[in-house]
Amino acid sequence: MKKYDRKIVLDIETTGMNPAGCFYKNHKIIEIGAVEMINNVFTGNNFHSYIQPNRLIDKQSFKIHGITDNFLLDKPKFHEISVKFLEYITNSDLIIHNAKFDVGFINYELNMINSDKRKISDYCNVVDTLPLARQLFPGKKNSLDALCNRYKINVSHRDFHSALIDAKLLAKVYTFMTSFQQSISIFDKNSNLNSIQKNAKLDSRVPFRSTLLLATKDELQQHMKYLKYVKQETGNCVWLEDKYN
């Protein structure tokens, strides 16, 4: 599979989902939010659209995203934004958390407007961050909220779920996960110090990814906070000793 430097981080909101059977059948997408990163740098080239679903929103879903039926009355339908959306994601690595959900809905919408039955994977690579999170944090909660809390990413501005806001949060989470895959377990205060140092030695034999060099100032400050936290909890932090003293 070809990998692209261009990463599109995506999230959607929907009218709801079915608790049994096909989870997306007869439900619709009501918001798509996506942000573009190149070499882990936000470009500002975002995609965002609310969508008129031509059906009512389930009460439980409204409690999650706060989007009302009346708000969507004058919004475009999916087929009206589909061409622009597909052009936007073409030739990219499409980063999604729990991709089965989003991809299922998007393919369902595409199948209703396209006779050729093309899928989203025909336009881009789909990368699911949930399996990666489970690999890094086995046995722990790995929802987007849990990951933001684990990485100390500020979500105070987020009263409801929003596709665009959640896409931006996931982009930050993805940057952390892919930049520090070997050493990320140090952020768990219950990690064994010997394991931490072993991981550090393993990391020292692997060149840093270029994306790490392009981390933003805020991301570097957040990483430094983690390192200081490790030292406070364990009494030692090999990263601070070797690289920052």
UniProtKB/Swiss-Prot annotation:
Q: Name one GO cellular component term.
A: cytosol
Instruction: Quote the record's binding site residues for a divalent metal cation 2.
Output: 11
Q: What sections of the protein cross the membrane? A: none
Query: Which Pfam families does the annotation name?
Result: RNase_T (PF00929)
Q: Name one GO molecular function term.
A: DNA binding
Q: Does the keyword rRNA-binding apply?
A: no
> Could you say which EC number(s) this protein's record lists?
2.7.7.7
The note on the cofactor says: Binds 2 divalent metal cations. Magnesium or manganese.
Q: Which Gene3D superfamilies match?
A: Ribonuclease H-like superfamily/Ribonuclease H
Q: Where along this sequence does the record place binding of substrate?
A: 11, 13, 60, 65, 166
Give the reaction(s) catalysed. DNA(n) + a 2'-deoxyribonucleoside 5'-triphosphate = DNA(n+1) + diphosphate
Q: Which cofactor does it need?
A: Mg(2+); Mn(2+)
Active site per UniProt: 161 (proton acceptor)
Keyword field: DNA replication, DNA-directed DNA polymerase, Exonuclease, Hydrolase, Magnesium, Manganese, Metal-binding, Nuclease, Nucleotidyltransferase, Transferase
Any one Gene Ontology BP term: DNA replication proofreading
Origin superkingdom: Bacteria
Task: Enumerate the residues binding a divalent metal cation 1.
Answer: 11, 13, 166
Keyword Nuclease in annotation: yes
Top-level enzyme category: transferase
What does the UniProt record say this protein does? DNA polymerase III is a complex, multichain enzyme responsible for most of the replicative synthesis in bacteria. The epsilon subunit contain the editing function and is a proofreading 3'-5' exonuclease.
PANTHER family given for it? DNA POLYMERASE III SUBUNIT EPSILON
Quaternary data: The DNA polymerase holoenzyme is a complex that contains 10 different types of subunits. These subunits are organized into 3 functionally essential subassemblies: the pol III core, the beta sliding clamp processivity factor and the clamp-loading complex. The pol III core (subunits alpha,epsilon and theta) contains the polymerase and the 3'-5' exonuclease proofreading activities. The polymerase is tethered to the template via the sliding clamp processivity factor.
Q: What is this protein called?
A: DNA polymerase III subunit epsilon
